[in-house]
A protein has these predicted regions:
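Extended, histidine- and acidic-residue-enriched regions that form the cofactor-binding/catalytic faces
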Residues: 1-113, 118-254
Length: 254
């Protein structure tokens, strides 16, 4: 099997893969953000990178080093900025980082680029960075960019299988069953099942306050219970994600 990690290649090897072989490059985008007492701060970028690796292996692509810092954690979907360890970027910083990175990949000769996002709050700023980079590259940009959130590839039957009592929604699934199960599949050594808290589900009002109110968020930072998480469920999810994202990449890029 050909190596897939850009940062483990020499520059001539990388050049051959993107310019001669036409390899699709995957750029994982995540965050450094609290995920309760049972998951690591790097969960978002670890999962984005792991999903990227699974799909890249399937389609013959490459995986770039992840963007490990993301947009500011929001109370209703990430617990907020008041937790120690959560290390975030302003919107303009993230947009600029994405803009520069996309332009650099175009300069390398990359023709197909996939931004695989693992941090809910990143979505709009990744989009803006991509859009500005494409504009910078002129009327006939040399590369095509796909942006995706990996959770959008879960099907309803899979969610019903994982949540027989009802799916609470992606925002409340922060550090809960989905992420914990996927971490058990990809990085079981980083999961502390014995520390899963009893907090959640969080009950938020239908509005936001600024400055944010930390009391809205359970003390653990977990927005729904992760006690139903299992490695088996993680395997179901990873299999579906890999199949469906690989199919989307092949559809758009051949």
């Amino acid at each position: 099997m050909k190596p897939i990690h850009m940062n483990r290649m020499s520059w001539p090897e990388y050049q051959r893969r993107v310019q001669k072989d036409g390899a699709t490059v995957f750029l994982p985008c995540g965050a450094t953000e609290q995920h309760g007492p049972h998951l690591p701060l790097g969960t978002d970028h670890l999962l984005a990178a792991a999903v990227s690796e699974s799909v890249a292996t399937r389609v013959g692509g490459l995986v770039a080093p992840p963007l490990a810092y993301g947009y500011k954690s929001q109370p209703k979907c990430g617990g907020g900025q008041h937790f120690c360890g959560t290390t975030s970027l302003d919107a303009a910083t993230l947009i600029g980082q994405v803009r520069d990175t996309v332009r650099e990949f175009a300069r390398h000769g990359v023709r197909q680029l996939v931004l695989c996002n693992g941090h809910y709050e990143n979505q709009w700023f990744l989009t803006e960075g991509i859009d500005l980079a494409i504009r910078d590259l002129g009327p006939n940009p040399p590369l095509t960019v796909m942006r995706l959130e990996y959770w959008d590839f879960f099907t309803n039957p899979t969610l019903e299988r994982i949540f027989p009592e009802g799916f609470p929604g992606y925002a409340l699934e922060h550090a809960a069953v989905l992420e914990t199960s996927m971490m058990l599949h990809y990085h079981p050594d980083l999961v502390r099942l014995d520390l899963i808290p009893d907090d959640g589900p969080a009950d938020f009002p239908p509005y936001d306050l600024y400055p944010p109110e930390p009391a809205w968020v359970p003390p653990s930072g977990v927005l729904s219970s992760a006690k139903a998480a299992t490695k088996e469920k993680g395997g179901w999810m990873v299999e579906e994600l890999t199949d469906r994202i690989a199919a989307a990449v092949r559809k758009e890029f051949g």
